[in-house]
Structures are given as structure tokens and as C-alpha cells.
């Protein structure tokens, strides 16, 4: 089944890509969730126009992403206050929403929570941590924060 992606799909492509997938994957996952549309000649022409406009937008986005990267790496004093046990273990864990809110509260730029990449071993104790923020393709910034007991 030939589809045009309307959003980025992991291990498949980004918005605007024309992909060939198995019928069941397309009908049962991609189409119902709005991640793709059926590739027709008219839709392919429309996507070409959208891609040209998107390329012009990406140039502006790269400049903005570089500015955000500089702002994030210069940011100091990002703290997240959470409830902990006496031994310093968190009740739960720090999530991407918490990091985005803490960066915003510290005077940093607005981030999309999907841009934050948490480590496999989640943040479950107090201390200093560092995570990556994927701003665009090829531009990754490090966000440093400290988890403290509330």
C-alpha cells in the first residue's frame, strides 16, 4: 500500500514522505490515527507544493533552533522540587513535562515535551542530571537540571 505520511513515524519516515507499507499496517494503524493518507496522483502533487514551502520554513527553523540551543546550554539554576522519601528516592519519577516546566520557570525557552529524551534509567532519586533535547534534525542541546526534595 502506497501512503503519504502526514506526521513523523519512527522507523518509517517524516511528514511528506511517500512510503510503501503492508496493507494491514496502513489500514489498521497509520490511516486511522491520521499519520498517513492514501497516495493518489493529486495528493502527490499537493505534497510537492507543501515540501517546497516546508524547505523554506526549515531554514528559518534552523536559525531558531540554534538560538534555543545557545539559550538552553547557558541556562543555570533549573531545579525540580518533588516529594521524596527520607532516603532521597522520589515518589514516582521526573517526567518530560516536569523538565519542560522547570526550564520555563528558570527563564528558558519553550520546549516541546516530545523533544526531551529521558535516559532508560529514569530519574528516580535526588541529584543533578543532564538530558538531551532534540530541537531539529542534527541540532541537539543538553539540558542540565537538579532534582531536590520538596
Swiss-Prot record:
Q: Which UniProt keywords apply?
A: Ribonucleoprotein, Ribosomal protein, RNA-binding, rRNA-binding
SUPFAM superfamilies xref list: L9 N-domain-like, Ribosomal protein L9 C-domain
Protein purpose:
Binds to the 23S rRNA.
GO cellular component terms attached to this protein's record = ribonucleoprotein complex; ribosome
Recorded hits in InterPro entries, A to Z, give: Ribosomal_bL9, Ribosomal_bL9/RNase_H1_N, Ribosomal_bL9_bac/chp, Ribosomal_bL9_C, Ribosomal_bL9_C_sf, Ribosomal_bL9_N, Ribosomal_bL9_N_sf
Stored Gene3D superfamilies: Ribosomal protein L9, C-terminal domain, Ribosomal protein L9, N-terminal domain
Q: Which GO terms describe its molecular function?
A: rRNA binding; structural constituent of ribosome
The organism's place on the tree of life at top rank: Bacteria
Question: What are its GO biological-process terms?
Answer: translation
Has UniProt tagged this entry with the keyword Ribosomal protein?
yes
Keyword match RNA-binding:
yes
Q: What is this protein called?
A: Large ribosomal subunit protein bL9
* UniProt similarity note: Belongs to the bacterial ribosomal protein bL9 family.
Gene transcribed to yield this protein: rplI
Amino acid at each position: 500500500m502506497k501512503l503519504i505520511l502526514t506526521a513523523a513515524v519512527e522507523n518509517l519516515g517524516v511528514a511528506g514522505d511517500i512510503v510503501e507499507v503492508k496493507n494491514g499496517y496502513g489500514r489498521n494503524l497509520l490511516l486511522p490515527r491520521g499519520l498517513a493518507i492514501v497516495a493518489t496522483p493529486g495528493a502527490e502533487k499537493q505534497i510537492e507544493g507543501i515540501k517546497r514551502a516546508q524547505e523554506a520554513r526549515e531554514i528559518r527553523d534552523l536559525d531558531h533552533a540554534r538560538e534555543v540551543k545557545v539559550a538552553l546550554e547557558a541556562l543555570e539554576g533549573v531545579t525540580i522540587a518533588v516529594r521524596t522519601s527520607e532516603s532521597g528516592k522520589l515518589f514516582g519519577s521526573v517526567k518530560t513535562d516536569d523538565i519542560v516546566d522547570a526550564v520555563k520557570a528558570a527563564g528558558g525557552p519553550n520546549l516541546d515535551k516530545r523533544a526531551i529524551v529521558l535516559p532508560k534509567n529514569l530519574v528516580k532519586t535526588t541529584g543533578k542530571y543532564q538530558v538531551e533535547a532534540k530541537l531539529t534534525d542534527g541540532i541537539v542541546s543538553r539540558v542540565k537540571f537538579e532534582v531536590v526534595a520538596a
